[in-house]
Amino acid sequence: DAGFMYAAKMSGQSESYDFFTPDAGELAFLADELAPHPFYTRGFILHPNDNVPDLIRRAYQHQNAARYLLVKGESDYIVHKSQVVQKVDQPSFEAMEAIGGTGDTLTGLLSVLCGADFELTDAAVLSAGANRWSGHYADPSPATQVIELIEKIPQALVKVLNEHNGKNDNER
């Protein structure tokens, strides 16, 4: 979680971890080699969505990133050792930004898929996709509660796993 990423950065242990799942604001803290706490992050945070690749580069440059990053946002960036290997941006729902807990569902999906021995890049891509598809199936509004998305995770996982395995939605 975010608090643990902060502790890993400040202890110099970031590179010891397989994954961090920051949003753009949390990534700005990882990218700022001088900030001892997110409150002190320099101006990077003011334009977080249009400079994500630069923030990724800076976080790795200063050894403040895990081996993999799954940067959450309008587009989800899957990164391995400073290289963006994939972006997941569909389906997209503005309303999901207002739903508390979607980062937790993403982290949970990622943990499950890593625990199921998926290759780490695949686990990140699939979890980002499943999290987004759970939103699609829940048809979110700003009033949607995260439990409504959680209830759609099995359906979303079937979809992304079928696509990953080369099956269409009608095959089981």
Name these PLM-found stretches.
Residues 1-3, 22-25, 30, 72-74, ...:
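Fold-independent oxyanion-binding glycine-rich loops
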Residues 1-51:
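Conserved beta-alpha-beta core of the PfkB/ribokinase-like small-molecule kinase fold
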Residues 24-26, 84-89, 96-98, 127-143:
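Glycine-rich phosphate/pyrophosphate-binding loop at beta-loop-alpha junctions
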Residues 29, 99-130:
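Short, small-residue alpha-helix embedded
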Residues 45-50, 88-111:
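Gly/Ser/Thr-rich active-site loops/lids in small-molecule metabolic enzymes
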Residues 52-97:
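Conserved phosphate-donor
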Residues 52-61, 119-135, 146-154:
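Short, well-structured alpha-helical segments that form the helix of a local strand-helix-strand
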Residues 132-172:
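Charged C-terminal helix
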